[in-house]
Structures are given as structure tokens and as C-alpha cells.
Amino acid sequence: MKVYNTLTNKKEEFVTLVPGEVKMYVCGPTVYNFFHIGNARTFVVFDTIRRYLEYRGYKVKFIQNFTDIDDKMIKRANEEGSTVKELGDRFIKEYYKDADDLNIERATKNPRATEFMEEIIKFVSDLIEKGYAYEIDGDVYFSTKKFNSYGKLSGQNLEELQLGSRINVDERKKDPMDFAIWKNQKPGEPAWESPWGMGRPGWHIECSCMAYNLLGETIDIHAGGSDLSFPHHENEIAQSEARTGKQFAKYWLHSAFVNVNNQKMSKSLNNFFTAREILEKYDADVLRMFMLSGHYRTQINFSMELLDSTKAALDRLYNSINNLENLLDEVKNEELRDEELEYKNELQKYKEKYIEKMDDDFNTADAISVIFDLIRDVNTNVTIESSKELVKYTLDLIRELGNPLGILQESTKASLEEEIEKLIEERQKARKEKNWALADKIRDDLKERGIVLEDTPQGVRWKQI
């Protein structure tokens, strides 16, 4: 298996610190709002990578944090008239709801930064003691010049960074690029007791501390969105390696941005979507497959038209699964015949090809193509004349390959019936309101999917054709 390591800017053989085990840390959300589709891509990508590693036999300890104390949290809490803790509690709950709806598996642990204050203070104290940090008027800064390899992740030179820095320079700092690891309390802000007075941690130190305490001095994979590479991950490396003298993370993985209608997503451009808004209109499988239809290191463009195309493609997959489920009930032959055994063995090539693609830096786009190829083959060769054993095997194989991607796991019968009944209700409502255009559109859309409606005195019935 090869993974692209941002630290070295090349694909490397994936060799874990302990054979068969993976220690993985992913930077999670700042819990002051619902997460948007850009965040959703990051969460889906690393959920998929975690699932695939488990599929390949690794035992994965997966940590994804909640940032529940920072400037954004404080600003939002003050605007709402709530406490930072109340805000964090609320949006952590909302995160779990949306993540569950998106079929994102629960992490081994989701630590909150505020649960680690004692450990953070110890971390900061150690850095001061080792000469990597200094205190001024209750603020503590990390000295970037003391860490000789600062810039190694982002490939940036410290002197060039200093020259081009647009940061509002605090004249008290020894160097413009030094960053805060502990902040002195300001009026109206939550604070904790420390050797430097009342204050709170800087953002970067929180992740370093949680990773250290939950996974140890060196971890296998540290991951997050590409926007975190600098300065967040660069600063994490500096703090962690300055403290321990050991490599912080062996492999650094970064997922690329989501653009909306070929523009960067932003509230000012009015092209900002939360995952929840999209999940109200589309199933999780659609959003997941869309997010995984491009390589995770490549930017993807989001639009409703592209989601509709993804849904249409996914419907074709589910129609094939539905046909196989129906065949399972209808076929007469129970046991595999000799010629079927040969065909069953031939189907293994799709599993091998899928693994080959996913082993190459988690190429989900090509892996999805393999699933489509498999289903095209099965549609042609698995029929009413096939044995029950072969039909079941093909169904199991499709679901096996869909599982690491978090798609194709539902029984189509239950989900299809639920969706159709919902559309029939919408059509009935449109007819009552004499909205004939909408009623006809719903009927025609269903017909395109192979569903025919029959209006009877007993109500609307439907059947597949």
C-alpha cells in the first residue's frame, strides 16, 4: 500500500510503527456552527481511509478532536448570550447528528480541548523549560527560530515567511513568526488557572496535546483539510517535536477544497451550504459518492447538477442491487454449478482491481469505477437461470466493495419503498392543490426510474417494470 505523504511530497510505502496497528489523528471541527460541505468532504475522506485500513486488516485507533475553545467560539457565544460550554455542547450534539446521517463511523474517541487543560498547561511548561517558549505578561509564545526544521511540512522558509508576513505583529514577541501557545485572559473570556495567570490555550497546542495524550509521542497518520497544512500542522510539528525530540507523525495526509459552481465556497458569495441542508434533499450515499468521485487530494466542484448526476448513477447501482435481491427470491437452483464456479472465480478480478486502486493512495474515484464495471458484468451474466448461491455471492461482493466507501449497504427494498411512498404523498398533495405540473413531473420522474403509478379507487399503487 502506498500513501502520499505531504511531509515528503511523494508516495511512500505504508509501514506502520506497530505491525497491523494504525494510530490516526484527524483535526476535527470547531464546534460553533453546523459543519459545511467542505468540512464534510474532509470527514468523509478520512472516514473512508479509516474504513479501508480496517478492511485491509489493520486495527485503527482513530482520534478526531472537537475544538471547543477559541476566538470563533467566544465571539459566537457572546453574540448569542450563551456560554462557550453551552455552545460547544449544542454543536457537538449537532455534529454527531449530521455525521451519523452521513454514515460517518464514530471515532475511537472525540476529545474536547477543554477536557485537557491540565495536560496542556504541562505541555506549555515543558516547552518553556526546554527553552522553546517564553512568557510575556501572561501570554506564552513558541519561539520558531529555536526549532531548526520549522517549515518542513509546508516547504516554507522561515526567513521568507518573516519578510512576507502580513500578521499584525505583537511588538513584545521576539520574532514575528512566533505563535501563541497560551493566551492571557481578556475581559469576558473563559479562562483557566495557570503558572502564567488566568488564561486559555492557543489553538495549535490543543491538537498537539490531545494527540500526545491519546496516541503517544509518535503517531502513524495525522490528517486534515489542506488549509490546515500551514500554519496549524506546521506549528503542531514544531511544538510536539520540540517537546519530545521525536518525530510527531510519520505520514501527513491532506484533503483538498470543495469549490461551489467553480468558485471558492464563502458566505459572502452566497454559495455556502451546510451538510445538513444537502442531506435534507439527498441521501447520504449520494453525498458520500459525490465526495469520493474525485481523488481526495484534488479539488472538487460542487453543484446541484453534479449531485443530480451522482444520484442518477447511484440509482443505477441500486436498481441492479434491487434486481439481484429480487432474483434471490425467485431463482429455483440452490447450489453452484460447475460453469458458475468458474464465473464466480472470474469475479475475483474486480476485488483485486479494487484493492489495487485503493492501495494506490486511496484512489476512491477509480475504485468506484471498478464497482460499476462489476455491476455491468453481473447484469449481463447473473439471471433467473443462475443459482441462489451465485446471486448471493454477487450481492455480497458488491456490498463488500461498497462498505469501505460507506455506500451500497442498505437493502434497496426498504429504502426504495420509503422513498416512493414519500413521493406519492407529495404527488397527492400536488393534485389536491391542483398543481398538475408538479404531479405529472413526479409521475414522469418515477417512470424514468422504472416505477409505474396506478390510480385506483383504493388509492395509488405502484409497481416496478
Swiss-Prot record:
It is an enzyme of class 6 (ligase). It comes from the Bacteria. A motif ('KMSKS' region) lies at residues 264-268. SMART domains: DALR_2. A motif ('HIGH' region) lies at residues 29-39. ATP binds at residue 267. SUPFAM superfamilies: Anticodon-binding domain of a subclass of class I aminoacyl-tRNA synthetases (SSF47323), Nucleotidylyl transferase (SSF52374). GO terms for molecular function: ATP binding; cysteine-tRNA ligase activity; zinc ion binding. Keywords: Aminoacyl-tRNA synthetase, ATP-binding, Cytoplasm, Ligase, Metal-binding, Nucleotide-binding, Protein biosynthesis, Zinc. GO terms for cellular component: cytosol. Signal peptide: none annotated. It is found in: Cytoplasm. Monomer. Belongs to the class-I aminoacyl-tRNA synthetase family. This is Cysteine--tRNA ligase. It comes from Clostridium botulinum (strain Loch Maree / Type A3). The lineage of its organism: Bacteria, Bacillati, Bacillota, Clostridia, Eubacteriales. The gene is cysS.
